[in-house]
Design a protein with these regions (language model features):
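Active-site glycine-rich loops that stabilize anionic/oxyanionic intermediates
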Residues: 55-59, 189
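A domain-start/cap signature at the N-terminus of enzymes
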Residues: 1-50, 58, 62-83, 111-122, ...
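Gly/Ala-rich beta-loop-alpha elbow adjacent to hydrolase catalytic centers
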Residues: 153, 157
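Structural cue for short, hydrophobic secondary-structure segments
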Residues: 51-56, 86, 249
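C-terminal catalytic histidine-bearing segment of alpha/beta-hydrolase fold enzymes
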Residues: 250, 264, 281-325
């Protein structure tokens, strides 16, 4: 199954999603649709791993659910005991087209990728929704043998996974009760930098001239103007915990098209590099320079472009999602 560029880069005014996920999770006063590979309303003692897969900008959770299932099939016995979870972050156009109930959470076309508040029914962050999923997994009556949780995304979903690894609170709560948590960030268009430095042509880093792009360091590209979800968190206090979390970056070796329609070509994104592969490798080098003991890992998947299904089914993808050797 090919998950390609349009996952992240549909034009403004995009059409509604074809399918609404069939399960529901209350989040505050709202409701989040999602796909589940097993009914979690009954105890699931056989589940030892939960894999949360985040869709791209098209919000096509059905496509990503199928891709997650294909990856699990490819992982074979390594995926035994896995619960697959694919939440769906809807837009207003989806709610109107499908005549969904007024309590269905929905965001603007892009705001959910940065953890911004929902448009309705309440200003609930997409990160609040991920917190709610992780809180559900903490229920030891429902998941008595759960040992690990993976939060993975490709393209626009990779942006969510990355930024949730920076700001999210749910993962630390899981770790506090003894569960392992990993974030898998595949082929996003941009990353969060912790200071005004950006890559230079000689492979180093230097303070980026703000006059060339006044918003280059604003959230979601930098730490200025964090979303309400962050609360009183000081940007300087976020970096060290992030560097210590288990994060895996996956980049397609062929995801190098500077003119690919879905590529974020804003000046803030362009300040990070010419294409996704370059941006990802530069960001990893940036983190390594700042944190020699960085807990993060990275892998390039040769011959794969902007294709989420192929990324997840690759050897590095199966290792990241299911610990397949």
């Amino acid at each position: 199954m090919m998950l390609v560029a349009a996952d992240e880069g549909y034009a403004p005014g995009e059409s509604p999603v074809r399918v609404i996920a069939d399960a529901r999770l209350p989040v505050g006063t709202g409701v989040l649709p999602l796909y589940l590979s097993q009914d979690w309303d009954v105890p699931l003692p056989a589940v030892t791993r939960a894999v949360i897969v985040l869709h791209g900008r098209r919000r096509d959770a059905d496509t990503y659910y199928a891709a997650a299932q294909n990856a699990a099939d490819a992982a074979g016995s390594a995926a035994r005991g896995s619960l697959l979870i694919v939440p769906q972050f809807l837009a207003g156009v989806d709610v109107r087209h499908h005549r969904l109930p007024p309590d269905m959470l929905h965001w603007t076309l892009e705001s959910w990728m940065g953890g911004e508040p929902a448009e309705a029914p309440a200003p609930i962050s997409s990160f609040d929704a991920l917190d709610a999923i992780l809180a559900r997994l903490m229920d030891r009556a429902g998941f008595p043998n759960l040992r690990s949780v993976v939060v993975a995304g490709h393209s626009g979903g990779g942006q969510v996974a990355h930024r949730y690894a920076v700001l999210g609170r749910g993962g630390d709560r899981l770790q506090a009760v003894g569960l392992a948590v990993r974030y898998v960030v595949a082929n996003p268009s941009s990353y969060v930098y912790f200071n005004p430095e950006r890559p230079t042509l000689d492979g180093g880093f230097a303070r980026f001239p703000a006059a060339r792009c006044p918003g280059f360091d604003a959230w979601k590209y930098g730490m200025n103007g964090l979303p309400p979800y962050a609360g009183a968190a000081a940007p300087a206090a976020l970096e060290a915990p992030f560097a210590g979390r288990q994060v895996v970056y996956l980049w397609g070796g062929g995801d190098t098209d500077r003119d690919q329609p879905a590529l974020d070509r804003s000046c803030a994104a362009a300040a990070q590099g010419p294409h996704r592969l370059a941006r990802g490798q530069a960001y990893f080098a940036y983190l390594k320079a700042r944190h020699p003991d960085l807990a993060h890992r990275a892998a390039v998947v040769p011959g794969v472009g902007h294709d989420g299904g192929a990324m997840f089914r690759s050897a590095p993808g199966l290792a990241a999602l299911f610990d397949k050797n």
